């Protein structure tokens, strides 16, 4: 949608903490500032009804979190297995977490993510080049930790080798 990111585009649970933690808190507390901010989001955990199309596959339903990333760590709160993430493969990692039905399901989802068990039924992890997210809800995004307003349709495409780095 005309915006670029290098690290992560995300929506849902704990996404707000990436752009609402104050710079002073981040300077003083580092990673812990995000955790404190994220804890405040626990009471407002809610599903977002979306349709996600990724390289010809379609995922529909209620998700509490979604991310399109090129990293093993998302705000320090979510970790991806470094053996499954390649920075130079021309693909993003698409991570979707389905809305748990019960508190036990939520606990199991958190355990699965902590243990990097991506075969858990509430977890979708794919390597993709192109993603389209469609929703009728207000779905704010975070792009590399900066607030990005909701849009009914968000298109994300990996642009391999789009940036050229020079050494002096």
List where the protein language model places each region:
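Catalytic core of DAGKc-family lipid kinases
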Residues: 1-65
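Short beta-strand-to-turn element immediately C-terminal to the catalytic PLP-Schiff-base lysine
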Residues: 8, 20, 69, 95-97, ...
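ATP/nucleoside-binding phosphotransfer catalytic cores, i.e., glycine-rich phosphate-binding loops
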Residues: 54-55, 60, 86-89, 96-168
């Amino acid at each position: 949608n005309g915006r670029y990111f290098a690290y992560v585009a995300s929506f849902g649970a704990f996404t707000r903490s990436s752009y609402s933690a104050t710079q002073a808190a981040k300077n003083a507390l580092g990673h812990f500032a995000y955790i404190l901010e994220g804890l405040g989001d626990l009471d407002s955990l809610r599903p977002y009804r979306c349709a996600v199309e990724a390289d010809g596959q379609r995922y529909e339903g209620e998700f509490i979190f979604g991310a399109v990333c090129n990293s093993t760590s998302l705000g320090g709160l979510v970790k991806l297995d470094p053996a499954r993430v390649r920075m130079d493969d021309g693909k993003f990692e698409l991570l979707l977490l389905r809305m748990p039905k019960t508190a036990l399901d939520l606990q199991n989802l958190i355990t699965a993510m902590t243990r990097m068990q991506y075969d858990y039924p509430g977890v979708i992890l794919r390597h993709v080049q192109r993603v389209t997210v469609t929703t009728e809800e207000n779905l704010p995004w975070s792009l590399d930790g900066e607030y990005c307003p909701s849009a009914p349709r968000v298109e994300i495409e990996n642009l391999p080798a789009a940036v050229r780095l020079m050494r002096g």
